[in-house]
Regions:
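Amphipathic alpha-helical dimerization/coiled-coil segments
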Residues: 12-44
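Residue-level recognition of alpha-helical structural elements
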Residues: 1, 24-31, 47-54, 70, ...
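Hydrophobic packing residues in well-ordered alpha-helices of helical domains and bundles
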Residues: 5, 31-35, 54, 58, ...
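C-terminal all-alpha effector/ligand-binding and dimerization domain
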Residues: 36-43, 48, 83-141
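Hydrophobic, amphipathic alpha-helical faces that serve as interaction scaffolds
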Residues: 1-24, 59-97, 133
Length: 141
């Protein structure tokens, strides 16, 4: 189940990011600002060791990426996938037992590639970031 959820998230989020990267500059910058805001919150909560708040900001960051595609059907599908992810991820792996340093660093790198409008690197890093969840689950089992 974890693998299927992560694979589906990867498909949706990378597609959405590719669509967002094709936007005209003004629209692109507005969407980028939203993603930056959540990335900054993740970093702030990481420094404050607020794992619940960080996890919520992380979910919002990924949702903002999907919303960047301007596709309501995709958003609706993603809400269901994100719900399944919450169940398999947060019930199986307690928040307080996690190391979020890699998550925050990944967000920083993804954001840099988005800012540079390097679609390939941004999508590849996002894909690796989500797929890292599968590896972390395997380590915990």
């Amino acid at each position: 189940m974890v693998k299927q959820v992560c694979e589906t998230r990867t498909l949706i989020e990378t597609y959405a990011l590719e669509k967002m990267m094709q936007e005209e500059e003004e629209v692109f910058q507005q969407k980028l600002d939203v993603i930056k805001r959540y990335s900054d919150k993740c970093e702030e909560y990481y420094r404050q060791e607020k794992s619940v708040e960080l996890a919520l900001a992380d979910l919002e960051l990924h949702k903002a990426i999907v919303e960047g595609a301007n596709n309501e059907i995709l958003n609706d599908v993603y809400v269901g996938i994100q719900g399944r992810f919450i169940v398999v991820n947060y019930l199986i792996r307690p928040l307080k037992n996690r190391n979020y340093e890699g998550t925050v660093q990944d967000h920083f790198e993804i954001l840099k590639f988005i800012e540079d409008r390097d679609t390939k690197k941004a999508v590849d890093k996002l894909r690796n970031h989500i797929q890292g969840t599968i590896k972390r689950f395997c380590e915990d089992e």
